């Protein structure tokens, strides 16, 4: 169901975190922010919110090669600078790097996290307690895998982003925790 753009301008109250995902909930007003810069395929800077990390998805790192660059380019196309997005927080609002963890909604109501997953440009990354939309995101990733979209189009993609960051494959270096 498309969420009309006008809903984003109504207010900035967040939906009840404990409520199930329903059409009624999706029509609830969301907080909004304006995209100012795309960092990579799963993070962007957003007005006064600061760095936003898309929940439940993990894009290849830019240093991983073309896959990382493709994911960033796709996010730039979906939510270019100046796009006002609706944002929804799950249980844990920040990650270990102090990025705001959010589900982001495009002006037409599509969930940005899910769109990146459905395009096959990210893997699913579940970190409890943030699991509100896990079935939805995992389903989109599974659909992309079955239809061989994005990362799944060839057998070349063999290093999950989290493994790359940990230095377990592809020449990545472990990233220090803060």
PLM-predicted stretches and their roles:
Residues 1-178:
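Small beta-barrel nucleic-acid-binding modules, primarily SNase/OB-fold domains
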């Amino acid at each position: 169901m498309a969420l009309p753009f006008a809903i984003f301008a109504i207010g900035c109250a967040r939906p009840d975190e404990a409520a199930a995902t329903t059409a009624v909930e999706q029509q609830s007003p969301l907080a909004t922010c304006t995209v100012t810069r795309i960092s990579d395929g799963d993070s962007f800077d957003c007005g006064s919110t600061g760095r936003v990390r898309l929940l439940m998805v993990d894009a290849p790192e830019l240093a991983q090669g073309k896959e990382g660059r493709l994911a960033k380019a796709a996010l730039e196309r979906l939510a270019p600078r100046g796009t006002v997005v609706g944002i929804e927080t799950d249980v844990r609002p920040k990650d270990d790097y102090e990025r705001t963890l959010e589900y982001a909604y495009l002006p037409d109501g599509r969930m940005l996290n899910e769109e990146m997953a459905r395009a096959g440009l990210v893997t699913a990354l579940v970190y409890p307690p943030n699991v509100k939309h896990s079935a939805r995101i995992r389903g989109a990733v599974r659909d992309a895998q079955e239809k061989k979209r994005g990362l799944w189009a060839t057998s070349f993609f063999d290093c999950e982003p989290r493994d790359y960051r940990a230095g377990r494959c592809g020449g990545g270096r472990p990233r220090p925790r803060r």
